[in-house]
């Protein structure tokens, strides 16, 4: 899948796919004359995630989005099962049922269309390019990567969950921080509208203050020493305090706890802190 996420891929989605998806999701709210930002954030991100994942929505309807939202929220319960206060066996059953329904309603039709296209391309009878999405990449490489149907289902479903839930929250936090900043600093309002780099700085600053998770849990695959000399045995859990790291005053200044899109940090420090962790995501 990493082959997808290159500059030309991002440019293609930014210019070709996202505008149409945003417009389609916006239309019902424009007709009503109002929107709830968290709800809109979830719905627009679920559609953007579906585009990248390779989930077709032939009707382009609100009911299709409703179904995807319901499935994805249930997948989120499975992804955060460790923290659930509900009976875990019941949550597992519900997630399994949601996966089955998602597979039948969305994945199988999307997969059938892509398999037919890939076959036609292989035979030379199709001039249309294969869709540029995760499902197509998985299907095209399933033999080389030994991917079975269950693995493909889980991979696509997890991407749908990961690509929508935290992004919707980030949109809401970012909008709130920018709105509050402009109330205090009205001179920056026009700059946000005209300067993409400044808008990006606003988003990075909000992500630093509002990581998707305040901590990251890892299990040691072998024994090692932490930089301070603490010994960690194989199999022990290591908790990384992302929130505290993002508020380190030596790195982000004496006002680290506050939103400041004009903040300057050293080149080696990501402006969004450890909100995305460090290293390759697998």
Per-range role (PLM):
Residues 241-267, 276:
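Conserved cytochrome P450 K-helix/beta-meander segment immediately N-terminal to the heme-binding cysteine loop
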């Amino acid at each position: 899948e990493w082959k997808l996420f290159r500059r030309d891929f991002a440019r293609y989605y930014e210019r070709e796919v996202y505008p149409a998806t945003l417009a389609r999701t916006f239309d019902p709210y424009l007709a009503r004359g109002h929107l709830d930002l968290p709800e809109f954030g979830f719905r627009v991100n679920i559609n953007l995630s579906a585009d990248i994942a390779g989930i077709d929505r032939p009707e382009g309807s609100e009911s299709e989005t409703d179904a995807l939202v319901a499935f994805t929220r249930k997948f989120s319960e499975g992804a955060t099962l460790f923290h659930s206060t509900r009976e875990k066996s019941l949550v597992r059953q519900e997630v399994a049922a949601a996966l089955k329904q998602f597979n039948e309603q969305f994945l199988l039709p999307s997969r059938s269309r892509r398999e037919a296209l890939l076959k036609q391309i292989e035979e030379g009878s199709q001039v249309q390019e294969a869709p540029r999405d995760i499902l197509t990449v998985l299907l095209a490489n399933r033999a080389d990567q030994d991917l079975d149907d269950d693995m493909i289902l889980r991979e696509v479903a997890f991407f749908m969950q990961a690509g929508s839930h935290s992004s919707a929250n980030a949109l809401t936090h970012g909008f709130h921080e920018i709105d509050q900043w402009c109330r205090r600093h009205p001179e920056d309002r026009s700059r946000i509208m005209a300067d993409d780099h400044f808008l990006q700085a606003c988003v990075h600053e909000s992500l630093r203050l509002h990581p998707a998770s305040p901590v990251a849990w890892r299990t040691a695959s072998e024994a090692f020493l932490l930089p301070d000399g603490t010994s960690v045995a194989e199999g022990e859990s290591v908790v990384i305090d992302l929130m505290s790291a993002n508020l380190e005053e030596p790195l982000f200044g004496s006002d680290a706890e506050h939103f400041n899109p004009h903040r300057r940090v050293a080149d080696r420090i990501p402006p969004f802190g450890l909100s995305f962790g460090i290293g390759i995501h697998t």
